[in-house]
From Swiss-Prot:
EC main group: oxidoreductase
CDD domains: TPP_E1_OGDC_like (cd02016)
Any one Gene Ontology cellular component term annotated for this protein: cytosol
Pfam family, one: 2-oxogl_dehyd_N
Protein's UniProt name: Oxoglutarate dehydrogenase
Oligomer status and interactors: Homodimer. Part of the 2-oxoglutarate dehydrogenase (OGDH) complex composed of E1 (2-oxoglutarate dehydrogenase), E2 (dihydrolipoamide succinyltransferase) and E3 (dihydrolipoamide dehydrogenase); the complex contains multiple copies of the three enzymatic components (E1, E2 and E3).
EC identifiers of the protein: 1.2.4.2
Length: 916
């Protein structure tokens, strides 16, 4: 079998001549062959590759113009492919004399193209059309080996590769105008002086300065100015703390006196916790030419790179917000650190999403502020395995432009190149701004302890502004007095701002910064117009009817057939039908809906089927997109297999999108902790830290069905631990009408709060959890649900309080036992606490003193520890509140069905006081 396989493969001797021809083409131009062969040839051993190259070139060499032309093309291709490896990118390296690197030495130093001396002698002596190989070498060395390193030959799309190649080789010699050069120098001086001013006024306060990477400021200035060439409406920035204050002041025009106030904490207040100044976001509108453009820097935590998907999600929200907008109207720019971009996994997650249908935004500009160190670690072998910190960009075929930050004119060139590429191909592009960090990780840190040689060099290295000033001075573009004069001018402006900084912010400013303290403890207080039963029936029939020309899978056909019966009031609405009808009601009123997550189109538990697949031609039909001509937009996307980046994306989407309900569903609630950073740092605390609100809905399937520790618990206890100051809403609905009403409440709520729903699994088709059409039409969301059986309150001896599906286990067993003396109450909203409603219900049983909190989760998990002291305060005097549930456990659940059933039975029997 193996012999036959070998003979039928490309390795067979019968294919040798064909492979030789392909290989010869590959040697001349690696991009000229199919990608599959490109991979094969590049994976050949280095020795064989070099020997083959030598053999080929020596055998084929003839003193003819055609042969030399091909060889020169090979030489040019070497520069395009490997030139970035020899470019002078590091500002801290001594700039060597280019002429010392001869053609022969260059080619021999290249690992991929070593050519024998005899061949080089012949090549160097040959002249073709008055162009010597020396001239070819000099010309292309000048293009590809100066202070910009172009890394793009890995791109598989030949159109993109050729476009970049042509842009570089035709525009590299473009010279900036004198006015532009002076403008760049001014930006550098302003950037440098602001940091020095901060240092002089606040020497002992952290600011994470931009010093060493000042070229970032003229780069971003150029981005903003250059975008007038495009139909751009908004730029959204994401960056960490390094250089943030400088960007806020010089790019987003945040008043410097406000930043001074933040240094002095003059405007600290007690209406929220706030955050450090280098985490705060800012938004402004600038006029560029005749066009206004919005600049928006997102607030972010210290967790590096997690802001990235938030920025892209916010960008997608802007595109989706208006049918007249597209990805040419928005530009996301993410500023990375060199250690973080190669170290943080969320970067890979986001890049994987960059061209996915539900997440693409027409390309992101990635700027790596590569200061060649991560806190105290500077050895590349300790920081990463890849050669370059930007190597991760290759996974999505993005071009990478390395540039020396001490050459601001080169920085401007790659900025133009990156912008043009992005708008032309609608793909991500990377700029590796190779710079250094003049101080320690922060200004009070001494970096010489761990990097003595490096920081000795940095100490004596001139700033970018000084170097560029000297360059312009030599070219007589400016005079000697320019620097001092302009520095005095900037100093005067900074002094004015500093003298104003101790003034308090206006009342208007304070008002817009404050957190709304509205009482929404009962989320059902938001006024909502119910939909009449007849109108709801019409709407349900629309979304549950499938066109006859679509061949539906038998199982899906039955589900939709049952849903039509629900619409006709012949059957109760299950969970999937109620959820879809809630979305339909919003869409019908012009409110858009976006659902995303792993397997949301069908639903992990086969319950949603929002997208119907034609079994004949694999086309898709989405009923919720076909309600009426003018309706809200409905977006539903099966996400990439990710939690952190996808949830962060949806958070970013929700904070900027208006008139849209945004839902993210975890495949199982257990997996949401893969995005714990987003939950902790953004969703639950973003409002209190940054005054940033969101109305994101998180559907987290939760419930103990014996499926093991990773398919049982959404970790209710974690969300309760994070709840405070009315920051989020947490519900555990047990009836299908509840999901219908809470979705509508969330969409219409005037107060934006994240909604965490512990959604069911086994209840999705459970008969007792279904609701009538009347309950959908006339009902409302209930934070607490009273006893549903007709019991005599005077005979009640015990009250069981619970949340979630365990209610039905208790109810079923109680009915079997015909116990009339035990009441079961459901707390459907566990945060904010429904104190008024619960107190009112408990008052009806004021003579009862035996209370049980019953839960499926272990004692140290679930809601018990959170509810314990709270519930005791609501109970009558001399009452006892006992716990019934699983014992404390490090693991959420057992992995054995037998043990699960035994535990579940014990919980039910103990709660109902049944002897086994």
């Amino acid at each position: 079998m193996y012999k036959n396989e070998f003979n039928s493969s490309w390795m067979s001797s019968f294919n040798s001549s064909y492979i030789d021809n392909l290989y010869n083409k590959f040697l001349l131009d690696p991009t000229s062959i199919d990608n599959s062969w490109y991979i094969v040839f590049t994976e050949l051993s280095k020795e064989n590759y070099i020997n083959s190259t030598n053999k080929y070139l020596n055998n084929k060499f003839q003193d003819s113009k055609d042969t030399i032309k091909l060889t020169i093309e090979l030489l040019i291709n070497i520069f395009r492919t490997l030139g970035y490896k020899f470019a002078h990118l590091n500002p801290l390296d001594t700039f060597k004399n280019d002429n010392s690197l001869s053609l022969k030495k260059f080619l021999k130093s290249s690992e991929a193209f070593r050519i024998q001396d005899s061949y080089l002698v012949k090549l160097s002596q040959y002249v073709l059309d008055d162009i010597t190989t020396k001239n070819v070498y000099d010309d292309y060395k000048n293009i590809y080996c100066k202070r910009i390193g172009y890394q793009f030959m890995h791109i598989h799309n030949s159109n993109e590769m050729n476009w970049i190649k042509n842009y570089i080789e035709t525009k590299h010699s473009n010279i900036l105008k004198k006015k532009k050069k002076i403008q760049i120098l001014k930006h550098l001086i302003i950037s440098e002086m602001l940091e020095k001013y901060f240092s002089s006024k606040f020497p002992s306060i952290k600011r994470f300065s931009i010093e060493g990477a000042e070229s970032l400021i003229p780069m971003l200035k150029e981005v903003i100015k250059y975008t007038k060439k495009f139909n751009l409406h908004k730029i959204i920035f994401g960056m960490s703390h390094r250089g943030r204050l400088n960007v806020l002041a010089n790019i987003l025009d945040k008043p410097i006196k406000t930043i001074f106030n933040e240094f002095c904490e003059n405007n600290s207040n007690n209406f929220n916790s706030g955050d450090v100044k280098y985490h705060m976001g800012f938004c402004c509108t600038k006029t560029i030419g005749l066009r206004k453009i919005i600049l928006d820097l997102k607030s972010n935590p210290s967790h590096l790179e997690v802001i990235n998907p938030v920025v892209v999600g916010s960008s997608r929200a802007y595109i989706d917000s208006n049918d007249n907008l597209n990805d040419e109207n928005i530009l996301p720019i993410i500023i990375h650190g060199d250690a973080a971009i190669s170290g943080q996994g969320v970067v890979q997650e986001l890049l994987n999403m960059s061209q996915a249908r539900g997440y693409k935004v027409g390309g992101t500009i990635h700027i790596v502020v590569n200061n060649q160190i991560g806190f105290t670690t500077s050895k590349v072998k300790d920081l990463r395995t890849s050669q370059y910190c930007t190597d991760i960009a290759k996974m999505i075929d993005s071009p990478i432009f390395h540039v020396n930050a001490d050459d601001p004119e080169s920085v401007i060139f790659v900025t133009h190149l990156a912008l043009n590429y992005r708008f032309c191909f609608k793909k991500d592009v990377f700029i590796n701004l190779v710079c250094y960090r003049r101080h320690g990780h922060n200004e009070i840190d001494d970096p010489s302890i761990t990097q003595p040689v490096l920081y000795s060099k940095i100490k004596n290295h001139p700033t970018t502004a000084t170097s560029y000033y000297n360059k312009l001075l030599l070219k007589n573009i400016i005079n000697k007095s320019f620097l001092i004069t302009y520095q005095k001018k900037i100093k005067k402006k900074l002094d004015v701002e500093y003298n104003l900084h101790n003034k308090k912010m206006s009342e208007k400013r304070l008002k817009c910064c404050s957190i709304v303290k509205a009482d929404y403890i009962n989320v059902s207080n938001t006024p909502i117009n119910n939909i009449s039963q007849s109108d709801l029936t019409i709407l349900a029939k629309k979304i549950f009817s499938i066109p006859n020309n679509i061949e539906v899978h038998n199982r899906v056909f039955k589900i939709y057939k049952d849903r039509l019966k629900m619409a006709n009031n012949e059957k109760l609405f299950d969970w999937g039908a109620s959820e879809l009808l809630a979305y339909a009601s919003l869409l019908n009123e012009g409110i858009s809906c976006r659902l995303s997550g792993e397997d949301v189109c069908r639903g992990t538990f086969f319950h949603r089927h929002a997208v119907i697949h034609d079994q004949k031609n694999d086309s898709k039909y989405i009923p919720l997109k076909n309600i009426k001509l003018k309706q809200g937009n409905f977006y539903i996307w099966d996400s990439v297999l990710s939690e952190e980046a996808t949830l962060a994306f949806e958070y970013g989407y929700s904070i900027d999108q208006k008139n849209t309900l945004n839902v993210w569903e975890a495949q199982f609630g257990d997996f949401a902790n893969g995005a714990q950073i987003i939950i902790d740092q953004f969703i639950c605390s973003g409002e209190q830290k940054w005054n940033v609100t969101c109305n994101l809905v998180m559907l987290l399937p939760h419930g103990y069905e014996g499926q093991g520790p990773e398919h049982s618990s959404a970790r209710i206890e974690r969300y309760l631990q994070l709840s405070a100051n009315n920051n989020i809403k947490i519900i555990i609905p047990t009836i299908s009408s509840q999901i219908y009403h809470i979705i509508r409440k969330q969409a219409f709520s005037l107060i934006k709060k994240p909604l965490i729903i512990m959604s069911p699994k086994s209840l999705l088709r459970f008969p007792l959890a279904a609701s009538s059409l009347s309950e959908l039409s006339n009902g409302k969301f209930r934070t607490v649900i009273d006893e549903i059986d007709n019991l005599d309150t005077k005979k009640v001896q015990r009250i069981i309080l619970c949340s979630g599906k365990i209610y039905y286990d208790l109810l079923t067993q109680r009915r079997i036992n015909q116990q009339k003396n035990i009441v079961i109450l459901r707390i459907e909203q566990i945060y904010p606490r429904p104190t008024k409603k619960l107190s009112a219900i408990l008052y009806n049983y004021k003579d009862v003193h035996d209370y049980i909190w019953c839960q499926e989760e272990p004692c140290n998990q679930g809601a018990w520890l959170y509810h314990k002291s709270y519930l005791k305060k609501l109970l009558p005097k001399h009452s006892k509140l006992n716990y019934v549930g699983r014992s404390s456990s490090a693991s959420p659940a057992t992995g054995y069905m037998k043990i699960h059933k035994e535990q579940q039975k014990k919980i039910i029997y103990d709660a109902l006081n049944i002897s086994d």
